[in-house]
Amino acid sequence: MTTATQSSAPGVNVDQAEVEKFSALAARWWDPESEFKPLHAINPLRLGWIQETAGSLSGKRVLDVGCGGGILSESMAVAGAQVTGIDLAEKSLKIARLHGLESGVKVDYRAVPVEELAAEQPGQYDVVTCMEMLEHVPDPASVVRACAALAKPGRWVFFSTLNRNPKSFLFAIVGAEYVLRLLPRGTHSYDSFIKPSELAASARQAGLEPTGMRGMEYNPITQVYSLSANTSVNYLMSTRK
């Protein structure tokens, strides 16, 4: 599994440039026509896949790792889960908290590294989600281990990230950032993309068993996202502890 550039301090698994990048966009997290439009568009797919795999979220304790402005966190809370969302971008968390107050959706947002939370609350969550986050940290395998530690035995951990191959470079960077302008330029670094085999290996080393994988595709003509068997660019992986 490849890694990103550098962390902001020894022992902290964070690329400060990534935190600053998303902090600069924080005010636009809940604008469905902003740079975060793709996340709003794919969120129903992510939520549906989680529910299809893990069952009803009602009454379950859920952790959303790398929650950003809370798009997925809120939707899981609306589905009945008791949700904690963690992120290291304080500005994004501020927006998430404000939106929660406006929408009346209760989520516990915390600015804490996932590794630190794993030491505090091992084996406490029924569902752990880590979506579109692994490609933005220096040591993704460390995040996978922490997510595994946080899950209860027999429960679920979900990941989504980007495959690493020429097609993903063409679609996720050239196409999405430069041609279609779905994302700001510089959102992704190709070297930080993760092959499914690499993620599966990290999951198994952390005590998680991969149980399923789905691809996510975008049709530029209809401007619609859909789940598919094609995992060559964006993919989601379910694992069980």
Curated annotation (Swiss-Prot):
Listed EC numbers: 2.1.1.222, 2.1.1.64
* An example Gene Ontology molecular-function term: 2-polyprenyl-6-hydroxyphenol methylase activity
Catalytic reactions on record: a 3-demethylubiquinol + S-adenosyl-L-methionine = a ubiquinol + S-adenosyl-L-homocysteine + H(+); a 3-(all-trans-polyprenyl)benzene-1,2-diol + S-adenosyl-L-methionine = a 2-methoxy-6-(all-trans-polyprenyl)phenol + S-adenosyl-L-homocysteine + H(+)
Query: GO terms for biological process?
Result: methylation
Top EC group = transferase
Family, similarity comment: Belongs to the methyltransferase superfamily. UbiG/COQ3 family.
Described function: O-methyltransferase that catalyzes the 2 O-methylation steps in the ubiquinone biosynthetic pathway.
Q: What is this protein called?
A: Ubiquinone biosynthesis O-methyltransferase
Quick one: which gene encodes this?
Answer: ubiG
